[in-house]
Design a protein with these regions (language model features):
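Membrane-embedded alpha-helical bundles that constitute the cytochrome b-like, heme-associated redox core
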Residues: 1-355
């Protein structure tokens, strides 16, 4: 027996004049207008249960296909799923991607114009322990987790624009599937290491009055004149408080929601969509901020990468870049060798702080 067709415009005489026409269910409508499923889709759009395969375990959304109407910042008043799509595709993706490109371009232009910040004086060969083994382990664990999350996140969010056209949909699908799992496993590692980093470096990141002068002079980035600072300057403290603590808490909290790792939380689609939007905005801002941090810690400043790799800096480096910290060390207020390992070796590090 073949499939019978029906013309949905073949309405029985005066069918629409029935006062209850608009309230008919699908069965009643089928009698006067066969094939017209408008009543069913009205119920679907109204959020009536029974129109999806979501099981009872997904309550209170079990059987619910279409979400209610909402209006998120940047979206029209529409169903929640469509509102989320509008915010993501019309705001987060284009403006977030533009911000990352602008920051990357600005860093490249700055490096092209200024190059690596070199030491003005000659190195003395006398080493000061800037980072203990514990501090370096915490930093590198967090840094590796961050890179894994950043790379996987960028590919997942923006990859369809610059990777998909090159490798094709099949390979891109496998790539994003793999990176999604990397992202989900690196997230908790980032969260734990972020907590350790915060408490490890908290003591030397409290604001001081000297930070005001540093900020007003822009850290001497354009004048070429170093502004005296303690162990961490005002720029590093901004990264610590705004990036590590502020954005870090938002990124981790929203990520834990997306990974469904918060006990007792009902993971409705609306909850996940809001968490996704917050996560997207916060991570883009964090990546933009940390791009500057990564630049200064690698090719932007002579000796910065070596300091985090080996733990040591030359006295000249300490005096030129963190003069107040250096003065405290010379005055005996702060030990030049902070870890038991450094003390045991008398601070005689065999590594170079000039890399």
């Amino acid at each position: 027996m073949g499939v019978q067709s029906a013309n949905i415009f073949s309405i029985a005489p005066d069918a629409s004049t029935d006062p209850k026409y608009a309230d008919q269910n699908n069965g009643e409508r089928g009698k006067v207008q066969p094939g017209n499923n408008a009543p069913m889709w009205r119920q679907v759009g109204a959020g009536v249960n029974g129109y999806s395969s979501l099981p009872a375990s997904e309550a209170p959304e079990a059987g619910n296909l279409i979400q209610p109407f909402v209006q998120y910042p940047g979206s029209k008043l529409t169903t929640a799923g469509e509102a989320w799509r509008q915010v993501r595709n019309n705001w987060i993706i284009p403006y977030g991607g533009s911000l990352l490109l602008i920051v990357t371009l600005a860093i490249a232009l700055f490096y092209y114009g200024k190059g690596t910040m070199k030491l003005h004086g000659a190195e003395t060969g006398r080493k000061i322990e800037r980072f203990t083994p514990l501090e370096r382990a915490a930093h590198w664990t967090n840094a590796i987790a961050f890179v894994l999350l950043a790379v996987s996140g960028v590919v997942i969010a923006f990859g369809k624009y610059f990777i998909l056209p090159i490798i094709g949909s099949a390979l891109f699908g496998w790539l994003t599937y793999f990176l999604k799992n990397v992202h989900n496993f690196a997230g908790p590692l980032f969260a734990v290491s972020l907590i350790i980093v915060f408490f490890t470096f908290l003591k030397d990141n409290w604001p001081s009055k000297e930070d005001i002068t540093w900020m007003l002079k822009g850290g001497g980035m354009f004048s070429g004149q170093e502004v005296p600072s303690h162990r961490f300057n005002a720029g590093e403290k901004v990264v610590f408080w705004l990036g590590v603590l502020g954005l870090g808490v938002i990124v981790v909290a929203s990520g834990l929601v997306l990974d469904k790792l918060i006990p007792g939380l009902i993971y409705e689609r609306g909850t996940m969509q809001i968490a996704n939007m917050i996560h997207g905005v916060a991570t883009v801002l964090m990546m933009a901020m940390f791009l500057g941090h990564i630049y200064m810690g690698t090719i932007g400043m002579q000796g910065a990468y070596s300091a985090m790799r080996t733990g040591y800096v030359d006295e000249t480096w300490a005096k030129e870049h963190h003069e107040l910290w250096y003065n405290d060390i010379k005055a005996g207020k702060i030990p030049a060798q902070r870890s038991p390992e450094a003390v045991a070796h008398g601070g005689a590090a065999s590594t170079s702080a000039s890399a």
